Amino acid sequence: MTKKKKNLFLEKINTSDSKLIENECNDKESLQRNKTFNNLTAKEWARLSKPIWDDLSSPRNKFQMNHGAVFPVKLVERLLHMYSKVDDRILDPFLGVGTTLIGCQNLRRNAIGIELNKEYANIAKDWVESNYDLFNKRDDFCFKVVNDDCRNISKYIEKDTIQLTITSPPYADFIQRSLSDRENVHKKSIIKGENNSTIKQYSNDKNDFGNLEYQDFLKSIKHVLKENFKVTKKGGYSCWVVKDHRDTKNGIPYISFHSDLAKVAE
């Protein structure tokens, strides 16, 4: 065998070996995906589940600007990747203007959102409608907006049908305090400037969780958590996006909202 033919022969072997290794890797990945509830590999899960998420902030669009407090679509999409898969059914009991539904639309999940405020519910419908394109066709998945009190979850959703809940409840009457804080302290901050972030009271509705005193809020949210548990599948997840708060006006330096909510949910 000439040197040229030998090198060509070895090159073919190396190419063949590379393809075999690639195929083996693909097979291993497929096996991993088939064994997990979210179709993620171990590497993908590790990358998504880092303890600090500092890469999710994004400017508010024209739909989000109508709401007093919204979270980024990127946050919804990360949670969807981590705790669900394509075709799963997702719930947001405090829908707002529909951010959760948009994330579901982008990643091919079915979703239902419940929103007390009629104006916000209509904005959510408009946003979902405007987000349809060649890849998100109307007949492929179901996105439903319900204009009602989220205390009535069981009226619209069957037991054991929800894989994942993603929501951010009104922070009792914290929003009223935040209005003053944003105006006086964060006037020129990046959250108000580059991100177009705004804060305003949700409504004057007596049933609005955002108008309740803190202790009344915790009592009322317990019912929603119970309803949420009923409709969630065995092995399903609930992600509630919250933040702690300060009430210096009443001499309370720190309100551990996240732990109070967890205690109510026990």
Language-model segments: which ranges?
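Class I S-adenosyl-L-methionine-dependent methyltransferase catalytic core
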Residues: 2-266
